[in-house]
């Protein structure tokens, strides 16, 4: 089992632009057959700090997710509005 914690840092002036893209990314990812969990949270103290908590059966499933049409279209659009680079933490179940 693979758990992913991914953080995005969006410039505050671009939140209205990226929020619909995040909503679409979450909706379509949750429909992927190998997606176990895919949740997006917003930091209460920093509305530009988004945290994905994902669960996949294995690395191959995550790799397949990263090749989907919605991921390859939406993530570069979102990344254009980053205040700083994303952080991704991959963890195996203990």
Each model region followed by its residue ranges:
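Residue-level signal for well-ordered alpha-helical positions
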Residues: 21, 41, 65-68, 77
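Glycine-rich beta-strand-turn "strand-cap" elements at beta-sheet edges
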Residues: 2, 40-46, 76-94
């Amino acid at each position: 089992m693979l758990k992913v914690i991914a953080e995005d840092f969006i410039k505050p002036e671009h939140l209205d632009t990226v929020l619909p893209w995040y909503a679409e990314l979450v909706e379509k990812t949750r429909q992927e057959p190998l997606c176990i969990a895919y949740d997006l949270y917003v930091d209460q103290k920093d509305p530009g700090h988004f945290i994905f908590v994902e669960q996949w059966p294995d690395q191959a499933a995550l790799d397949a997710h990263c090749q989907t049409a919605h991921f390859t279209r939406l993530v570069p659009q979102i990344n254009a509005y980053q205040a700083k680079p994303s952080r991704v933490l991959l963890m195996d179940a203990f």
